Design a protein with these regions (language model features):
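Bacterial N-terminal signal peptides
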Residues: 1-10
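Sequence signature of WD/YWTD-type beta-propeller architectures
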Residues: 15-277
Length: 277
């Protein structure tokens, strides 16, 4: 049984044109980690700290479903563009070697099918499921951009060394990317006009076309001591903290009107937001 406790506080960031309408703590009978929201924000996927198993939570009905119990099933699952299906990888050991397959689960009827049989080849589920995406290449020294199936390779920063966390905006007008040594940037899809946004911005994701939601972390050289959800306005470059020091956030996901984040100890929160453009 799922219980939702709401804490509405009407917190407004006028300069960033983003309003936090309410925050809801979603209390589950188990821990929740590594959340992923569906495109329309009605379903959130979650897993265990080690990515074993994958479950879905319907935010309207509070229903939790088991999608898969396999090893690695919770690592970067991908929704279809209509939000009706989820594709994910599971890991098995064959003759002492690790192999991964790709499965597809239908959220409406519960049907599950294997798309790719176990293989040792590297499989990118983003490229398999969607025709529009941005992803760092295997060597992390460039980014592949696919717009409606047309793929180009870009290197947005002349002295960039390693790229991580790249994603095309919802309207397909821009992309963000993180250069591991310097931080988060936003640019045109061809990599031009790269603009610096933040030094520490982990797990970034789009909230509409004007904001990037990310995790700002601090550490003492050994462990994370602070991890806050931040909202970054890509036009003004203003950064607003959305959570406090008492909440050690470990994972997040967002849409244009919702942010879901999980804490280090497995608590899940739903933050309803309003963006005025």
């Amino acid at each position: 049984m799922l219980i939702v406790a709401m804490m509405a506080f009407g917190m407004t960031m006028s300069a960033a044109e983003l309003t936090v309408v309410s925050t809801e703590k979603i209390v589950l009978s188990e821990e929740a980690h590594h959340p992923t929201l569906s495109p329309n924000g009605d379903v959130v996927l979650f897993t265990q700290p080690n990515y074993k198993g994958l479950k879905s939570l319907n935010l309207a009905t509070n229903e939790v479903k088991v999608i898969d119990e396999g090893v690695g099933a919770g690592f970067e699952p991908i929704f279809s563009t209509d939000g009706k299906e989820v594709s994910f990888k599971t890991e098995i050991i064959v003759d002492g070697l690790s192999q991964r397959d790709v499965k597809c689960y239908n959220l409406e009827n519960g049907n599950k099918a294997q798309l790719i049989k176990p293989t040792r080849n590297n499989i990118d589920t983003r490229a398999l499921v969607n025709k529009t995406y941005a992803k760092p290449n295997a060597d992390k020294q460039s980014i592949s951009i696919s717009i409606d199936g047309v793929v180009t390779e870009v290197n947005p920063i002349k002295d960039g060394y390693r790229y991580i966390w790249s994603e095309v905006s919802p309207s397909k007008g821009k992309m963000f990317f993180n250069e591991i040594y310097t931080g988060l940037y936003v640019s045109e899809l061809d990599g031009s006009k790269a603009q610096y946004l933040a030094a520490r911005a982990d797990f970034p994701c789009w909230a509409g076309d004007k904001y990037v939601i990310a995790l700002k972390t601090k550490d003492d050289g050994y462990v994370i001591t602070s991890a806050k959800v931040i909202a970054i306005n890509i036009e003004t470059k203003e950064i607003v903290e959305l959570t406090d020091d008492e909440t050690l956030v470990a994972g997040l996901t967002a849409t244009a009107d919702k942010i879901v984040y999980t804490t280090e100890n497995g608590e899940m929160y739903l933050m309803n937001i309003k963006i005025t453009e």
